[in-house]
């Protein structure tokens, strides 16, 4: 029996549909019965409407017109206009992309092919130093240079690689380039992430060591040192006058920023006096009078400042997130303070680059730069290949101090990101001449290869992109025009058709589904194009594009796909060959869903290469309206290759090995190679249905509701044929019928002639019924209001002859009962009610010579795919668990399809009647409430008297009525039973009150002894705790059922006690309560008295006492007792949708370890996760939930029962929580999950892994 909580809430009726139906009913009610003809039915169904002008206007909003059954506008066709507009914009964008990058306004980025953001950051900063770029351009290779042996750096190859990178960045027409891979190989950089500032320092040191070994390297090294190398002087001064100085070369400044918030404050601390308390003067031999100070003696043109953003603590190295305010211009005296023997050429230094380390700690992050262009003086954000202008320059306009920053913090002004994460600052000396000179490019012989490669790649890609966009736009416009023409032919109205059989009905959802799937297929290419691919996919795609572009540049004629089977002069031939190859590889029946089919279709379209635009016009003349063309490929199959001979491109055709089929035979190309677009759409369509009336014909209700559309017959049948729809009728009793195709009907479909006239007449009867019922309902309400005058109890006076009694309950439910009776009568005559199903039939393609059949990728409609495993999808993804075998349901479906191949559609009904559907209707008998179980008049029901005329109005709605005359007497047996019950209840209430007074003290003594757990020496017997609870809750209102002393819940099947006394584990279960002999006799005597008073015929049964000696239960059944204890213990671990608490503990934090199993509220709440689980869930499912919260992979999680206790490793993943004995709501003793940190593997190519700054380049060329 269904619980009330499981019942579905009653659905509210659609008021719009009710209004349409009531409008039709009112029209029929106002019509005489002899005038209800077929013409009137057509009028009521609104099939006499003219063309709908309300929705003929263009609108981007979809809406189903329910006022006019002929209106098929705005079902989804309007979305195609937007798609064409987007494709036209894409075409224009492709033409714009043919324009070269503005070399003066848009910098080019560097693609990050691995964990090389630190290399890109270094290169992009120093590329924007014109002096350094010119220095690289001026380097010349030498034939006399002998490359050193590994691991020493090949300085010539390195300088030429830098030259190639800088030249490409300066001249490439693309917005990004990938030129860092060659430099990484020369420097033997691994895939680990490194520190950007350390890389720059190591790189310049390596150049200093290796350039002197090159014939042309000494001049380059001198210019390099003059650019960024300065000289500092460290002075140690004593108060006695002793003074010592030491000069050294300085490449960069490393500032400690802990405790400082501005760059000037950090510089003051760096260049300020430092007192050496432990230093002893060699002259005066005194300690504590010595000071140390550093200062610049010679300032370089470019000053590099590195901000030390990490510190060492007891917890390891931590990143400093201190905001650092730095100025856009800084005076030279901030660096050169005391020694002015060599004054700087300029008084100011301007900020031109900021290196930013983005990340939460010192072990992980990502580098990017903010750089000022030396050409246009604009600021840009260089984030690998993404380069964008920033509206506001970084830094502060003027130098600030700590005092200024304190007022800023007081005003609660937020710090910008560049100040919170700046890691390196670069300042350039402000010289007298501006702008800076544009670097002169290297000689032509050094850059000719790169120049040619860039030009060929740009011309090939842009031309290919434009032609592909033009073809896609043409195909899209052609397909959309075809859909518009098809739907235009479908539209009809009263002026266009002459006979009713010229109008057919199609489900509105079918028309919408066709348009929706046409739209999805049409936008498939664009959607896939805009979808953001992963980094590995992008890299692969770039390699393929480069290879294809090189082939295009080698020959202007080689614009077709290299995989095409034979050269052709039309785009259709090229597309057909590509499509055939893709389809041949996927001919094996594969249980993929419709979404996978759509993705495959989109990928097929992407593989198709582009043909010249002039061929599209030739193709347009040969195309038909209903499908894309198919091309027969002649034998033998030839494969086209290009070969360069004497500077000219030659085409060589060689016979390709025939593709082998799945059964080992060679396949042929006799079948068409191009799949029509309509077949692709059919693979995505769902099932649709039209409800049939109870007479097996077309009901008028779907027409009124707008659920079906009236369309022209011939175009409708053509539409169903194009998308391969099949129909069947499924009756409510489970019978399936495949109707025969009638004359001139390729597909069975309802026409206007099939409108059921019986249902139309029933609608008229329904209107009359409702009107009459409304009048009689007023009569019923009047009878109920006159209850005092009509009730047999409130007005016991004698009634006139012929008056009858009606149950008050029957009158209260009169309207509902009347409508149910009518529905039952209709249901008995409506034995053919069901639905007409439209299902897109699976397509079959048969190879002529291969000897096997292939199925389409489309799944059976209405049957969703079942999961290949009971493990959740997320678990399959994480642990790569899953089966590649086909589900049994899929195999069964395909076997059934294969058996029916080649046979015609069944024309006879399939005997599949469901016996459960043939349930007899319940008969409704009006006023049956007054019939008692003895066959007389029920004494317990309220009865209201009605006149014979009123009774005639009431009984007309029912086939069966129970007449009760007012003169008839009620059932004597029912009357006597009521009297006895009343008298017995009063006596029992009094006895209960007296008994409670007598046993009150005894009951309190028993309860107090049970709570204190005292072992009384006088305890002789045991009684069930359930009886004590019932006795305590007994009141005078429950007098009719006094509790009995039943010991069954304490006795096992061996009639021995198996439950013990009260303890912590069984406080919710029944247990033994100890009683003295006097207490036992008191309870037994009082209950006997109540039982005897309640029923004189009752037979007294002595309860079975449970003897107790010396506080122990006698004759305890040990076997059953052990089983009961085991069952009680297991009950703790059986739960449904309860919380499992898991605490995340970091072993590096002593506080976490101390509070891992803490009892304090704050200790428990820290890093505590509550996860809803059931005892039947597996441990893997719990770990998957923890993965969502902690991002630790399930198989890597260190999960323990307690801190230092049992570990739940991988071997326990498939065990349930019940098997592992995990109790719910364990917030006092949660599971322990150890926090972990993972470092990236060598194969990872993202920038989100761990980074360890300044850990060196030991294994690279920079260290030798």
Swiss-Prot record:
Belongs to the peptidase C19 family. The active site is at residues 117, 366. It comes from Caenorhabditis elegans. It is found in: Nucleus; Chromosome. Residues 565-575 have a biased composition (Low complexity). Broadly expressed. Expressed in germline. GO terms for cellular component: chromosome; cytosol; nucleus. Its EC number is 3.4.19.12. Recognizes and hydrolyzes the peptide bond at the C-terminal Gly of ubiquitin. Involved in the processing of poly-ubiquitin precursors as well as that of ubiquitinated proteins. Required post-developmentally to restrict the plasticity of epidermal cells, probably by regulating gene expression. Keywords: Chromosome, Coiled coil, Hydrolase, Nucleus, Protease, Thiol protease, Ubl conjugation pathway. Residues 390-415, 522-610, 630-679 are annotated as: Disordered. GO terms for biological process: protein deubiquitination; proteolysis; regulation of protein stability. This is Ubiquitin carboxyl-terminal hydrolase usp-48. Residues 587-599, 663-678 have a biased composition (Polar residues). PROSITE patterns: USP_1 (PS00972), USP_2 (PS00973), USP_3 (PS50235). It comes from the Eukaryota. Residues 108-430 form the USP domain. One of its GO terms (molecular function) is cysteine-type deubiquitinase activity. Changing residue 101 to K: In ot872; temperature-sensitive mutant. Residues 516-547 form a coiled coil. It holds the Pfam family UCH. Residues 403-415, 532-543 have a biased composition (Basic and acidic residues). It catalyses: Thiol-dependent hydrolysis of ester, thioester, amide, peptide and isopeptide bonds formed by the C-terminal Gly of ubiquitin (a 76-residue protein attached to proteins as an intracellular targeting signal).
């Amino acid at each position: 029996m269904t619980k009330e909580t499981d019942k579905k809430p009653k659905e509210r009726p659609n008021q719009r549909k009710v209004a349409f139906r009531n409008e039709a009913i009112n029209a029929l009610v106002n019509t005489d019965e002899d005038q209800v003809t077929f013409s009137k039915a057509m009028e009521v169904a609104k099939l006499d409407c003219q063309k709908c002008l309300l929705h003929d206007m263009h609108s981007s909003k979809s809406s189903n017109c329910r006022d006019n059954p002929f209106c098929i506008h705005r079902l989804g066709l309007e979305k195609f206009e937007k798609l064409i507009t987007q494709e036209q914009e894409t075409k224009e964008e492709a033409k714009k992309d043919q324009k070269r990058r503005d070399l003066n306004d848009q910098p080019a980025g560097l693609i990050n092919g691995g964990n090389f953001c630190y290399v890109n950051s270094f290169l992009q900063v120093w590329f924007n130093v014109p002096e350094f770029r010119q220095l690289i351009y001026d380097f010349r290779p030498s034939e006399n240079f002998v490359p050193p042996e590994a691991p020493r750096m090949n300085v010539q190859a390195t300088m030429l690689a830098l030259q190639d990178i800088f030249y490409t960045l300066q001249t490439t027409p693309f917005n990004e380039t990938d030129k860092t891979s060659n430099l990484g190989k020369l420097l033997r950089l691994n895939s680990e992430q490194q520190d950007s500032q350390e890389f720059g320092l190591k790189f310049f040191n390596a150049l200093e060591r290796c350039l002197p070994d090159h014939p042309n390297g000494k001049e380059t090294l001198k210019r390099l040192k003059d650019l960024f190398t300065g000289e500092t002087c460290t002075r140690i001064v004593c108060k006695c006058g002793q003074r010592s100085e030491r000069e050294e070369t300085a490449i960069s400044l490393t500032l400690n920023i802990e405790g400082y918030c501005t760059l000037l404050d950090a510089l003051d601390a760096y260049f300020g006096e430092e007192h050496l308390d432990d230093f002893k003067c060699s002259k005066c031999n005194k300690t504590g009078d010595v000071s140390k100070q550093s200062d610049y003696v010679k300032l370089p043109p470019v000053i590099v400042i590195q901000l030390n953003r990490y510190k060492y603590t007891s917890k390891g190295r931590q990143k400093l997130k201190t905001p650092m305010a730095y100025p856009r211009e800084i005076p030279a005296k901030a660096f050169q303070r005391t020694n002015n023997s060599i004054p700087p050429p300029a008084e100011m230094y301007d900020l031109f680059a900021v290196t930013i380390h983005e990340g939460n700690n010192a072990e992980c992050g990502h580098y990017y730069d903010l750089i000022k262009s030396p050409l246009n003086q604009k600021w840009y954000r260089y984030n690998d290949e993404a380069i964008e202008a920033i509206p506001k320059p970084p830094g502060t306009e003027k130098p600030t101090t700590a005092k200024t920053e304190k007022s800023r913090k007081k005003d609660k002004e937020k710090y910008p990101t560049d100040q919170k994460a700046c890691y390196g600052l670069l300042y350039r000396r402000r010289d007298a001449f501006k702008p800076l000179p544009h670097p002169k490019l290297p000689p032509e012989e050094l850059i000719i290869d790169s120049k040619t490669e860039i030009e060929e790649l740009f011309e090939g890609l842009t031309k290919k992109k434009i032609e592909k966009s033009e073809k896609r736009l043409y195909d899209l416009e052609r397909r959309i025009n075809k859909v518009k023409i098809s739907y235009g032919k479908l539209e009809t109205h009263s002026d266009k058709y002459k006979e009713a059989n010229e109008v057919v009905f199609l489900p509105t959802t079918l028309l919408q589904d066709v348009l929706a799937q046409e739209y999805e297929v049409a936008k498939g290419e664009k959607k896939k194009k805009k979808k953001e691919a992963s980094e590995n996919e992008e890299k692969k795609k770039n390699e393929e594009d480069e290879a294809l572009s090189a082939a295009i540049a080698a020959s202007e004629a080689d614009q077709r796909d290299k995989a095409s089977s034979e050269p052709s002069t039309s785009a259709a031939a090229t597309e057909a060959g590509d499509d055939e190859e893709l389809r041949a590889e996927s001919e094996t029946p594969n249980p993929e869903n419709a979404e996978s089919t759509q993705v495959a279709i989109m990928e097929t379209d992407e593989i198709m290469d582009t043909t010249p635009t002039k061929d599209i016009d030739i193709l347009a003349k040969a195309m038909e309206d209903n499908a894309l063309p198919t091309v027969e490929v002649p034998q033998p199959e030839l494969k086209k290759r290009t070969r360069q001979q004497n500077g000219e491109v030659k085409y060589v055709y060689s016979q390709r090995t025939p593709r082998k089929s799945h059964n080992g035979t060679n396949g042929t190309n006799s079948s068409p190679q191009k799949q029509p677009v309509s077949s692709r759409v059919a693979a995505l369509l769902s099932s649709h249905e039209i409800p049939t009336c109870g007479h097996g014909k077309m009901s008028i209700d779907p027409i009124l509701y707008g659920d079906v559309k009236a369309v022209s017959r011939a175009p409708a049948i053509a539409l169903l044929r194009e998308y391969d729809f099949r129909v069947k009728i499924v009756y409510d009793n489970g019978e399936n019928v495949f109707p025969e195709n009638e004359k001139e009907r390729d597909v069975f479909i309802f026409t206007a002639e099939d409108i059921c006239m019986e249902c139309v007449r029933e609608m008229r009867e329904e209107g009359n019924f409702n009107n009459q019922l409304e009048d009689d309902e007023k009569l019923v309400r009047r009878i109920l209001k006159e209850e005092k005058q009509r009730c047999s109890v409130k007005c016991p006076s004698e009634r006139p002859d012929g008056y009858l009694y009606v149950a008050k309950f029957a009158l209260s439910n009169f309207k509902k009962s009347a409508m149910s009776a009518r529905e039952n009568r209709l249901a008995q005559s409506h034995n053919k009610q069901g639905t007409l199903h439209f299902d897109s039939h699976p397509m079959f393609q048969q190879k002529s010579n291969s000897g096997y059949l292939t199925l389409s990728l489309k799944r059976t409609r209405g049957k969703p795919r079942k999961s290949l495993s009971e493990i959740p999808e997320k678990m399959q993804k994480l642990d790569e668990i899953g089966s590649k075998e086909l589900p049994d349901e899929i195999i069964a479906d395909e076997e059934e399809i294969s058996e029916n191949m080649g046979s015609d559609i069944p024309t006879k009904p399939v005997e599949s009647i469901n016996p459960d559907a043939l349930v007899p209707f319940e008969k409704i008998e009006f006023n049956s409430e007054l019939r008692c179980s003895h066959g007389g008049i029920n004494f317990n029901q309220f009865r209201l008297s009605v006149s014979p005329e009123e009774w005639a109005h009431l009984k007309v709605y029912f086939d069966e009525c129970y007449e009760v005359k007012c003169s008839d007497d009620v059932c004597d047996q029912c009357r006597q039973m009521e009297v006895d019950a009343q008298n017995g209840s009063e006596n029992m209430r009094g006895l209960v009150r007296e008994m409670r007074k007598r046993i009150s003290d005894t009951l309190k003594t028993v309860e107090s002894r049970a709570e204190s757990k005292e072992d009384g020496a006088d305890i002789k017997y045991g009684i069930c705790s359930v009886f004590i609870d019932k006795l305590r809750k007994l009141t005078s209102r429950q007098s009719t059922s006094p509790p009995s002393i039943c010991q069954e819940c304490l006795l096992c099947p061996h009639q021995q006690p198996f439950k013990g006394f009260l303890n912590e584990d069984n406080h919710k279960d029944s247990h033994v309560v100890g009683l003295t002999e006097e207490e036992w006799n008191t309870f037994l005597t009082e209950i006997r008295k109540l039982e005897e008073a309640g029923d004189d015929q009752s037979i007294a049964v002595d309860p079975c006492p449970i003897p107790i000696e010396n506080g122990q239960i006698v004759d305890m059944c040990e076997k059953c007792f052990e089983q009961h204890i085991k069952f009680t213990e297991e009950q703790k671990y059986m739960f449904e949708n309860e919380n499992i608490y898991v605490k995340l503990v970091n072993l590096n934090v002593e506080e976490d370890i101390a509070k891992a199993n803490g009892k304090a509220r704050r200790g428990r709440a820290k890093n505590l996760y509550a996860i809803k689980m059931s005892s039947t869930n597996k441990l893997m499912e719990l770990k998957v939930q923890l993965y969502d919260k902690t991002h630790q992979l399930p198989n890597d999680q260190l999960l323990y029962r307690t801190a230092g206790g049992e570990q739940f490793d991988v071997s326990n993943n498939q065990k349930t929580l019940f098997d592992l004995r995990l109790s719910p709501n364990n917030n006092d003793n949660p599971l322990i999950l150890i926090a972990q940190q993972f470092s990236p593997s060598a194969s990872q190519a993202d920038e989100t892994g761990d980074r360890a700054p300044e850990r060196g380049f030991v294994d690279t060329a920079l260290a030798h």
